[in-house]
């Protein structure tokens, strides 16, 4: 009996040791599934950071977005994910254009923008109705449309990119800054263009300083403005600072008090951004936003200067898919004809 009891004790001890050994292995060994993930993470393709680029595709000017996307895709090896934002009626068209052209290889998502979010926030202004189009305000709502990224690039559709978009994405944002823009006074080479077409590059050109609400901001009217057609944004800071809510507040105040209008320099989308981001933004390399190409059908930059530029922006009335306009050859290099034939370039011989 004593022998049997001793055998049972030994068996119990062995059982306890076996259980301990199993538990030790489970705690300290890397599971096979995790090992596989580790191998995958070490592969260059998986390590490559995704670069989200937001661009709008508006009815009547969808070819602009296509040319912009084409130029970005052709000039980089980076892992770019395009978020193409449009209204519900335009989404099928942009899908077909991309899927039936050489852009079918790009990574993209088509995102619907609901214009109802703007109800009661836009003051109607007949002087430049194109500036009141809903997609002009997509940049205000970036965190609501693009949710899985920490850093996002937003681009107007009337641009082409001649550099590697990775460089723009690598723009450093200072702590506490939700966005980076290009200052309107940052590049001496553009000053002559600005003077020749009578453009404003200060807050005076965008805000109505006759209004008390504007004067109460304490911003000097001679403060250099910035252009929000190219944005590198930090989504965490944007949400933390409630940037979208701040922009909406100034939109609603403009409806009530007419603090700015499209008769001023940048219309109704730039002005609230100038207010909200005053003194609280980082800067983009000036060569990554050469603008004003659309302000005059006659005034031109030098060919050498344009070749050095990383990004060209036809902000203004004179767009490169229309006539008259300048430097259209640089834009048309990246244009891909519409497979459906709906979008056509306007040229003097057409």
For the regions a language model picked out, list residue spans one by one.
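Glycosyltransferase catalytic domains, chiefly GT-A lineage
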Residues: 2-350
């Amino acid at each position: 009996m004593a022998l049997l009891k001793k055998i049972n004790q030994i068996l119990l001890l062995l059982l306890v040791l076996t259980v301990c050994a199993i538990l030790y292995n489970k705690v300290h060994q890397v599971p096979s599934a995790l090992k596989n993930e580790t191998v995958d993470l070490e592969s260059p393709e998986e390590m490559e950071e995704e670069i989200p680029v937001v661009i709008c595709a508006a009815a009547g000017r969808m070819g602009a977005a296509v040319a912009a996307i084409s130029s970005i895709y052709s000039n980089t090896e980076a892992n770019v994910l395009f978020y193409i934002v449009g209204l519900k009626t335009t989404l099928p068209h942009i899908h077909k254009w991309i899927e039936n052209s050489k852009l079918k290889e790009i990574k993209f998502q088509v995102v619907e923008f609901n214009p109802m979010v703007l109800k009661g926030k836009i003051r109607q202004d007949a002087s430049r109705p194109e500036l009141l189009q809903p997609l002009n305000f997509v940049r205000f709502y970036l965190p609501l449309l693009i949710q899985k990224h920490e850093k996002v690039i937003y681009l107007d559709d009337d641009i082409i990119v001649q550099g590697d978009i990775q460089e723009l994405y690598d723009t450093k944002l200072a702590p506490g800054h939700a966005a980076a823009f290009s200052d309107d006074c940052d590049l001496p080479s553009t000053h002559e263009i600005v003077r020749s077409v009578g453009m404003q590059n200060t807050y005076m050109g965008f805000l109505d300083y006759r209004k008390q609400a504007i004067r109460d901001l304490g911003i000097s009217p001679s403060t250099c403005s910035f252009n929000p057609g190219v944005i590198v944004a930090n989504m965490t800071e944007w949400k933390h600072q409630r940037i979208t809510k701040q922009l909406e507040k100034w939109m609603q105040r403009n409806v009530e008090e007419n603090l700015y209008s499209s008769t001023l320099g940048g219309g109704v989308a730039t002005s609230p951004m100038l207010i909200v981001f005053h003194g609280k933004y980082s800067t983009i390399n000036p060569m990554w936003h050469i603008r004003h190409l659309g302000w005059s059908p006659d005034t031109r930059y030098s060919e050498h200067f344009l070749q050095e530029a990383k990004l060209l922006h036809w902000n203004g009335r004179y767009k490169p898919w229309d006539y008259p306009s300048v430097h259209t050859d640089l834009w048309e290099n990246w244009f891909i004809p519409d497979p459906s034939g709906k979008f056509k370039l306007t040229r003097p011989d057409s």
